[in-house]
């Protein structure tokens, strides 16, 4: 599933290509993925709208349109949003293409999704910034208002284990399985530790490592195992730099011990039992 670094990479790759362009029409081939404001049709509501800015909130991509509305795109497990310039639009269409946006410069924006879990939702800009999905979102880990003091105060109030806490989007927006495992590994913290058991120094390590691993993921253009590519169809490179995720049975990059892969609440968790306490 695309996490914060992947969605931010998609945003950056598309911003210079489609900002300022107008949506001439939309072909929607899988209606169940698209939602519009009450009383409007998705395709009609987008026709003639200009894309004025691309943003992101957590794992949600935000296409801000004129008229103070926003198209919220949640890629979920296997969603892809790829832009094709006019000279590229004759390229064969990928299987599972569920929506095509025709832009006024002759280019196309194609949304594909093998698993069909992703959604395209048109809402007011204010609503998109406040709550783009069903649940309330926590702070942005790379945001200027995400301070260590606030993070530490939030930790001491939680008896939740660290791994599920980092996956809780109401606690922090944007982390998923990959970057939660990586942050805990770098911070040398066991995923089963409870948040309230961390002392100040451990909390600071976790705070710093969350921000570091997310920024490194962005710098590497995301993590590509199977489905993820950016808005130009390019794979990321962070999979080559992972410490624990996807490396079960391999030696720890820090101590040489064996990386374990275990199930936690139905999710795979990767960690080094020697380093992470």
Swiss-Prot record:
Its EC number is 3.2.2.23, 4.2.99.18. The active site is at residues 2-3, 59, 267. A zinc finger (FPG-type) spans 243-277. InterPro entries: DNA_glyclase/AP_lyase_DNA-bd, DNA_glyclase_Znf_dom_DNA_BS, Formamido-pyr_DNA_Glyclase, FPG_cat, MutM-like_N-ter, Ribosomal_uS13-like_H2TH, Znf_DNA_glyclase/AP_lyase, Znf_FPG/IleRS. SMART domains: Fapy_DNA_glyco, H2TH. GO terms for molecular function: 8-oxo-7,8-dihydroguanine DNA N-glycosylase activity; class I DNA-(apurinic or apyrimidinic site) endonuclease activity; damaged DNA binding; zinc ion binding. Its cofactor is Zn(2+). Involved in base excision repair of DNA damaged by oxidation or by mutagenic agents. Acts as a DNA glycosylase that recognizes and removes damaged bases. Has a preference for oxidized purines, such as 7,8-dihydro-8-oxoguanine (8-oxoG). Has AP (apurinic/apyrimidinic) lyase activity and introduces nicks in the DNA strand. Cleaves the DNA backbone by beta-delta elimination to generate a single-strand break at the site of the removed base with both 3'- and 5'-phosphates. This is Formamidopyrimidine-DNA glycosylase. The gene is mutM.
